[in-house]
Swiss-Prot record:
Subunit structure: Part of a complex consisting of a common heterodimeric core enzyme, composed of catalytic subunit let-92 and constant regulatory subunit paa-1, that associates with a variety of regulatory subunits which confer distinct properties to the holoenzyme. Interacts with akt-1 but not akt-2. Interacts with sgk-1. Interacts with P granule components meg-1, meg-3 and meg-4.
Gene name for this UniProt entry: pptr-1
Gene disruption phenotype: Mutants have small gonads and the number of progeny is reduced. At higher temperatures, 20 percent of mutants are sterile with no gametes. Mutant embryos display several defects in P granule partitioning during the first cell divisions. Unlike in wild-type, plg-1-positive granules becomes unstable during mitosis resulting in their disassembly and in the loss of asymmetric segregation of plg-1 between somatic and germline blastomeres. plg-1-positive granules reform during interphase but are fewer and smaller.
Protein name: Serine/threonine-protein phosphatase 2A regulatory subunit pptr-1
Biased segments, Polar residues type: 528-542
Length: 542
């Protein structure tokens, strides 16, 4: 509401006397002469908590006209045909009056007259051929604007979680629903002429309409979605403006506010718009995908609109398969690191894309894609691992993997083999065995080679660990029993395997002499030669 059309009535507000005890005074009783200082001690001591509902109630969001009394007009169907347009306009003017629904018993008769008039207008526009004449266009648009355009209230719950909390519903919905229904029937009528409507439905009107998508009421957002889609379809001159402003709203949501209620509904509209893009795609549309759509994967409330977002991304790839590498690059960039539920959503979207990907594009993304999948199947969170392993249940994806098994198997095998021995969840272990069995059937020779290589690498890794432990034990022994004064630590003091370990792990590292017993740090150090030829000294681990 813009301002208030009514005033509060009742007894004049009495200012209470200053508090002389309580939190403002540290619990001490104050003398009368000290009262004047209470405000300075606690300037908010007189402020009483006011509920959010009361504050919204008092600060009107509509231009409510409580003084206007509506009069019951004649029925349109009982009026002569030549008099009907004038009566329709009169009823539309009558419906411009907005009532206060926060007071459920106020102006009940007028509210009922308006409700009946709206229902009658809906029936008239829907069932009467030629009902929409040029003279009623401004009256319809003005009535709609008066009813729906308003300042949306702040959320009653500052910690509102759309996934957990119930949304705040619009109290004036009994009238608002009928206004939206009337406007929708008006736009969808075969008698509607866009050439006349564009005089009244302009950029300013659309801008206000888009702002309403932040409404918490899902019923209103659903109507707005349909209305905006009809406007986009009928007014060609507004299409670029609508797309541009939606872009701006998304960018503000991602990079500034992180809060907007209508993302899902706007993405539904965009999904339909993208589906109608002509080929080849314009550069403007490709930029929209990369700069606007894909960053929508970042916000933490992704689950509220992920299905619609994934649909839009898939639509783009179906239109132009060459966009596939860019899409996967962005998905991997925004891949969640600490939120398992988001990771499951990302995996679902990847599978949707792989369902429609072309083999040539698949080959371009094998390395980054399957390295990420290897991380996912290794996840200790069983839902993430399970969702990644379900890719091997998809016949089309399986055929793509089979055609490129020589590239996929070396990436996936180490993770799968390790999980089959170590994962805590037996369901995951069973799924991994199925995948390994599939790999063995695809390319048995490569499978045997990978198995042998992996086992050999594991043995070498265990040996390196043993050598490392022995090395540090020798270091500790040298520290406890330093060599005689003047005697240097040479490689001959080390077992042959430890010398090999030094050469293997750091070919540029050579032992330094241990400090003499006469002073200095007795801990041995090593010198490491850098690529530039300079040397740095690093104390050995104790």
């Amino acid at each position: 509401m813009h301002g208030s059309g009514h005033s509060l009535t009742g007894a004049p507000h009495q200012i209470p006397p200053p508090r002389t005890q309580g939190a403002a005074t540290g619990g001490q009783q104050l003398s009368a002469t000290a009262n004047q200082f209470v405000d300075k001690i606690d300037p908010f001591h007189n402020k009483r908590g006011t509920s959010r509902r009361l504050r919204i109630n008092n600060s009107s969001r509509y231009n409510v006209d409580s003084a206007q009394e509506l009069v019951q007009l004649a029925l349109i169907k009982d009026t002569a045909a030549n008099e009907q347009p004038a009566l329709v306009i009169e009823k539309l003017v009558q419906c411009q009056h907005v009532f206060d629904f926060y007071d459920p018993v106020a102006q009940l008769k007028c509210k009922e007259i308006k409700r009946a008039a709206l229902n009658e207008l809906i029936d008239h526009i829907t069932s009467t051929k030629g009902a929409i004449v040029e003279t009623i266009y401004p009256a319809v648009i003005k009535m709609v604007a008066k009813n729906i355009f308003r300042v949306l209230p702040p959320s009653e719950n500052c910690e509102f979680d759309p996934e957990e909390d119930e949304p705040t519903l619009e109290v004036s919905w009994p009238h608002l629903q009928l206004v939206y229904e009337l406007f929708l029937r008006f736009l969808e009528s075969p008698d509607f002429q866009a050439s006349i409507g564009k005089k009244y439905i302009d950029q300013r009107f659309v801008l206000k309409l888009l702002d309403l998508f932040d409404s918490e009421d899902p019923r209103e957002r659903d109507f707005l979605k349909t209305v905006l889609h009809r406007i986009y379809g009928k007014f060609l001159g507004l299409r670029a403006f609508i797309r541009k402003h939606i872009n701006n709203m998304f960018l503000r949501f991602v990079y500034e506010t992180d809060s907007f209620n209508g993302v899902g509904e706007l993405l539904e509209i965009l999904g339909s718009i993208i589906n109608g893009f002509a080929l080849p795609l314009k550069q403007e549309h490709k930029v929209f995908l990369v700069k606007v759509l894909l960053p929508l994967h970042k916000p933490k409330c992704l689950s509220l609109y992920h299905a619609q977002l994934a649909y839009c991304v898939v639509q783009f790839i179906e239109k132009d398969s060459s966009l596939t590498p860019q899409v996967f690059e962005a998905l991997l960039k925004f891949w969640p690191r600490t939120c398992s539920s988001k990771e499951v959503m990302f995996l679902g979207e990847v599978e949707e894309i792989l369902d429609i990907i072309e083999p040539e594009q698949f080959k371009k993304i094998i390395d980054p894609l399957f390295r990420q999948l290897a991380k996912c199947v290794s996840s200790p969170h069983f839902q993430v691992a399970e969702r990644a392993l379900y890719f091997w249940n998809n016949e089309y994806i399986l055929s793509l993997i089979e055609d490129t098994s020589s590239l996929v198997m070396p990436i996936m095998f180490p993770a799968l083999y390790r999980i089959s021995k170590e994962h805590w969840n037996q369901t995951i272990v069973a799924l991994v065995y199925n995948v390994l069995k599939t790999f063995m059937e695809m390319n048995g020779k490569l499978f045997d080679e990978l198995t042998s290589t992996y086992k050999g690498e594991r043995l070498r890794e265990k040996q390196r660990e043993k050598d490392r432990d022995a090395f540090w034990k020798k270091m500790e022994a040298l520290e406890l029993n330093p060599p005689a004064e003047g005697k240097e630590v040479t490689p001959s003091l080390f077992p042959e395997k430890l010398t090999d370990y030094l050469k293997k792990d750091g070919p540029n590292m050579t032992p330094l002499p241990v400090a003499t017993a006469g002073g200095g740090d007795k801990s041995p150090s090593v010198v490491k030669k850098s690529s530039t030829g300079s040397e740095t000294t690093t104390p050995a681990k104790k």
